Curated annotation (Swiss-Prot):
GO terms for cellular component: extracellular space; membrane. It is found in: Secreted; Membrane. Keywords: Cytokine, Glycoprotein, Membrane, Secreted, Signal. This is Lymphotoxin-alpha. The keyword Glycoprotein applies. The lineage of its organism: Eukaryota, Metazoa, Chordata, Craniata, Vertebrata. One of its GO terms (molecular function) is cytokine activity. Belongs to the tumor necrosis factor family.
Length: 205
């Protein structure tokens, strides 16, 4: 009688065993390595191979806009897109110096301006300057421009040195498709117009 602790296995020749292992490996290898196309329909697999970034781009792009002030306009603040570091993305458009919101949702809206001026001479009358910058919303829900972000400052120019003041503000807002975002600025002749100092934008969260 065979002892219980010993098991007898049938002897298999080396060549036969190798062939069995090779066949098993060929069956399991595609699934184990996660080769492209496994688990996909033929059309889906072909699309993934031909356009590997197409689906990723559609899923990650969100509406966004970044505008800069036009330096060629000294007495007005006109916004520009598609130049330097300015852009319009995924539905945003610029019309009548206003951003048009492409889809309803929550957006982060921001803007910055920088003002500067020269020192006054002792004989000149040094009167205070009122500087202000405001981001406004015009919507079908309101018959007028509603202030969203606002900054004001009174500047008293000195007699010896030039002056420089900046204003930045930004916050998140619930916006509706078709809403218009614009700005109003007091003290435009004192603006320092460059891509890094005067800008305005919004992006979907």
């Amino acid at each position: 009688m065979t002892p219980p602790e010993r098991l007898f296995l049938p002897r298999v020749r080396g060549t036969t065993l190798h062939l069995l292992l090779l066949g098993l490996l060929l069956v399991l290898l595609p699934g184990a390595q996660g080769l492209p196309g496994v688990g996909l329909t033929p059309s889906a697999a072909q699309t993934a191979r031909q356009h590997p970034k197409m689906h990723l781009a559609h899923s990650t792009l969100k509406p966004a806009a970044h505008l800069i002030g036009d330096p060629s306009k000294q007495n007005s603040l006109l916004w520009r897109a598609n130049t330097d570091r300015a852009f319009l993305q995924d539905g945003f458009s610029l019309s009548n110096n206003s951003l048009l919101v492409p889809t309803s949702g929550i957006y982060f809206v921001y803007s910055q301006v920088v003002f500067s001026g020269k020192a006054y001479s002792p004989k000149a009358t040094s009167s205070p300057l009122y500087l202000a910058h405001e981001v406004q919303l015009f919507s079908s829900q309101y018959p007028f421009h509603v202030p969203l972000l606002s900054s004001q400052k009174m500047v008293y120019p000195g007699l010896q040195e030039p002056w420089l003041h900046s204003m930045y503000h930004g916050a998140a807002f619930q916006l509706t498709q078709g809403d218009q975002l614009s700005t109003h600025t007091d003290g435009i002749p004192h603006l320092v117009l460059s891509p890094s100092t005067v800008f305005f934008g919004a992006f979907a969260l």
